[in-house]
Amino acid sequence: MIARLAGRIAEKRDDHAIVDVGGVGYLVHLSQLSLASLPPPGEPAALRVYTHVREDALDLYGFATEDEEAVFRALIDVKGVGPRAAQNILSGIEARELAQAVAQGDVARLTKVQGIGKKTAERLVLELKEKLVALARAAGPARAGAEADVLEQLRTALLNLGYRPPQAEGVAEALRDSAEGRPLDELLREALKLLRG
């Protein structure tokens, strides 16, 4: 079972990257947040990996952080949530924010994430509340630290996606007034829309 890959980023696509390790290219499925945190193609990178073995395929799911991997593994233990669905959920909400919403039983927050309906949100709260409570505590009551530097995270993500520093800075400044309390993935989607014009 593959648990970690370290090599160079060969390609970055909408939902995956190809990591070149010793001349072999591994296709690794990634959430939008992990994908945005990767360096540009040609640069070295290391990813935590979950190997999903099926009868007809072997899929790799990658994570930029330990928290994201822990939440992913918890999500796939929930009935009706497979690896693809878990990855899609983590594209719509940061791992710690999801853990906090589950720990607080915040069904309304969970249903704002694409791919999570009311029944799935209730199931997540019911099945994961105890598993994710430690991670939720680490997130803090108001995520003040994350909110304070979300614009810096946005700039870094845009630079890693290949945008020039003036472009990243300009879009971050344009979104400054609306950034407070919004998750990085939401701001990143809006920033990409602005950049694509």
Curated annotation (Swiss-Prot):
Annotated spans, Domain I: 1-64
Entry-linked Pfam families: HHH_5, RuvA_C, RuvA_N
Family in the record: Belongs to the RuvA family.
Gene that produces this protein: ruvA
Subcellular location per the Swiss-Prot or TrEMBL entry: Cytoplasm
GO CC terms of this entry: cytoplasm; Holliday junction helicase complex; Holliday junction resolvase complex
Annotated segments matching region Flexible linker: 141-145
SUPFAM superfamilies from the UniProt entry: DNA helicase RuvA subunit, C-terminal domain, Nucleic acid-binding proteins, RuvA domain 2-like
Region (Domain III): 146-197
SMART domains attached to this UniProt entry: HhH1
Record comment regarding domains: Has three domains with a flexible linker between the domains II and III and assumes an 'L' shape. Domain III is highly mobile and contacts RuvB.
Residue segments, region Domain II: 65-141
UniProt function note: The RuvA-RuvB-RuvC complex processes Holliday junction (HJ) DNA during genetic recombination and DNA repair, while the RuvA-RuvB complex plays an important role in the rescue of blocked DNA replication forks via replication fork reversal (RFR). RuvA specifically binds to HJ cruciform DNA, conferring on it an open structure. The RuvB hexamer acts as an ATP-dependent pump, pulling dsDNA into and through the RuvAB complex. HJ branch migration allows RuvC to scan DNA until it finds its consensus sequence, where it cleaves and resolves the cruciform DNA.
GO molecular function: ATP binding; four-way junction DNA binding; four-way junction helicase activity
Taxonomic superkingdom: Bacteria
A GO BP entry: DNA recombination
Description of how the protein assembles with itself and partners: Homotetramer. Forms an RuvA(8)-RuvB(12)-Holliday junction (HJ) complex. HJ DNA is sandwiched between 2 RuvA tetramers; dsDNA enters through RuvA and exits via RuvB. An RuvB hexamer assembles on each DNA strand where it exits the tetramer. Each RuvB hexamer is contacted by two RuvA subunits (via domain III) on 2 adjacent RuvB subunits; this complex drives branch migration. In the full resolvosome a probable DNA-RuvA(4)-RuvB(12)-RuvC(2) complex forms which resolves the HJ.
Protein name: Holliday junction branch migration complex subunit RuvA
Organism of provenance: Anaeromyxobacter dehalogenans (strain 2CP-1 / ATCC BAA-258)
UniProt key word Transmembrane: no
Keyword terms of this UniProt record: Cytoplasm, DNA damage, DNA recombination, DNA repair, DNA-binding
